[in-house]
A protein has these predicted regions:
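Compositionally biased, low-complexity intrinsically disordered regions
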Residues: 14-16
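Conserved catalytic core of sirtuin-type NAD+-dependent deacylases
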Residues: 2, 20-261
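Intrinsically disordered, low-complexity segments
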Residues: 10-11, 26
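Polybasic, lysine-rich low-complexity intrinsically disordered segments
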Residues: 4, 11-12
């Protein structure tokens, strides 16, 4: 088939047929789009606690007391204290083998990471296309204007103001707030040629719904140390391992995919 196309091109394009062949070569070398959705489980192995402990608390706090707009209105000092501590924890943490393993896949794939995590471990591991669904702990913003966003590595205090005069708050999407990046994430998922879920059990929405936006019939994988059965994990390759171990296994499974997708 390729020889027939080659001869047809040679006849049709004449001296331009080498250009045609070069275009075919570029198409064959185009990296396949690998979309990865990551959750708290991938950063847990770097020492960052998951969103809920077994007792239903988050770093010893009730979610409602530190991660909702109502909490911010009721006790902003407590909220700032909570996120200041989390920021320190993130700065002390280091990317683990799962983070670096996903970054290494960029050698063979066009990797897009969509993360529910607010840390920067994907970026520090070398990932170049990272979309943060729930905000970033190393950024802060005006409480009145979500377009006024600033980098930060220190604490935020009551009285710290944005340029519009409003109090600065963590650049985090709290519970009961809309998820601004969800539409962009849906678009990315819709272009996937392979979809991988790491460190999340697919029970927290709207992020869990992203898998449904991936094209039907593409290779799909889920990596987590404990995967509950839900309709979301049907027709998907399950790797029930911790993220660091599972991403290593994934690398082997993806070796042939870069040519066969």
């Amino acid at each position: 088939m390729f020889r027939k196309a080659y001869l047809t091109a040679e006849k049709s394009f004449g001296t331009l047929y080498p250009v045609f062949i070069y275009i075919l070569f570029l198409i064959s070398m185009k990296k396949k789009k690998l979309v990865v959705l990551t959750g708290a489980g991938i950063s847990a192995e770097s020492g960052l606690k998951t969103f809920r402990d077994s007792d239903g608390l988050w770093e010893g706090y009730n979610i409602e007391d530190v991660a909702t707009p109502r909490a911010w209105k009721k006790d902003p000092e407590l909220v700032l204290q909570f996120y200041n501590l989390r920021r320190k924890n993130v700065l002390d943490a280091k990317p683990n083998a799962a983070h670096t393993g996903l970054a290494a896949r960029e050698k063979d794939f066009d990797v897009h990471s969509i993360t529910q995590n607010i840390d920067d471990l994907h970026e520090r591991a070398g990932s170049t296309k990272v979309l943060h669904l729930h905000g970033q702990i190393l950024k802060m913003r005006s409480e009145k204007n979500d377009r006024l966003v600033y980098d930060i590595i220190h604490d935020i205090h009551l009285g710290d103001k944005a340029e519009d005069g409003a109090q600065l708050r963590p650049h985090i999407v709290w519970f009961e707030e809309p998820v601004p990046m969800i539409e962009e994430a849906m678009a990315v998922a819709g272009e996937a040629e392979c979809f991988v879920v790491v460190g999340t059990s697919l029970v927290v929405y709207p992020a869990a719904g992203l898998l449904h936006y991936a094209p039907h019939g593409i290779p799909r994988f889920i990596i987590d140390k404990k995967i509950p059965y839900t309709s979301a994990v049907q027709d998907i390759t399950v790797i029930e391992k911790p993220a660091t171990e599972g991403v290593g296994l994934l690398a082997e499974l993806l070796k042939d995919l870069k040519f066969s997708i």
